[in-house]
Regions:
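Amphipathic alpha-helical packing segments from all-alpha helical-bundle domains
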Residues: 106-131, 137-138
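Short linear capping/connector segments at secondary-structure termini
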Residues: 71, 102-108
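Basic, amphipathic alpha-helical hairpins
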Residues: 18-25, 69-75, 95, 126
């Protein structure tokens, strides 16, 4: 990715997290986010459709990075699900301040949906036969 694009993405996300830590999602405007990120509104809209699209992208990114941090060096199976659960819990504790900001207010309930999506991806990558098996596909 182009360095300028990376810097712009980082500025947008940092500005959003700063605002989200102080305000409800519905109260954040593109105008104030752009002022804080030192970008034009057209630049923001080149990256995201609206504030809600940015929020959705950050939610998925946060949960994905939590899962990536625990699956990087260890092989999980259904037989050692207790180890996976413990590691997942510890990863969430380590990232709790970011998770609290991104999933605060009305968005708190979306954390479960994002978790379910990532767990399905993880299980189906290891056990693809479970995806279409009604008895095994408990998610």
């Amino acid at each position: 990715m182009d360095l300028r694009v990376e810097k712009t993405e980082r500025a947008i996300k940092n500005a959003f997290l700063s605002l989200r830590g102080r305000k409800a999602l519905e109260k954040i405007t593109v105008k104030e986010l752009c002022a804080l990120a030192c970008i034009n509104k057209s630049t923001f809209y080149a990256h995201y459709e609206d504030i809600y699209a940015l929020s959705d992208a950050l939610e998925k990114e946060v949960v994905h990075s939590v899962f990536k941090s625990i699956t990087g060096g260890r092989e999980y199976t259904l037989e050692n699900s207790d180890v996976f659960t413990r590691d997942l819990y510890m990863a969430f504790v380590a990232n709790s301040s970011l998770i609290d900001i991104v999933f605060s207010g009305k968005d708190k309930s979306r954390l479960g949906d994002c978790l379910e999506e990532e767990i399905k991806k993880l299980i189906w990558s290891k056990y693809p036969e479970y995806k279409n098996d009604i008895e095994r596909n408990i998610l």
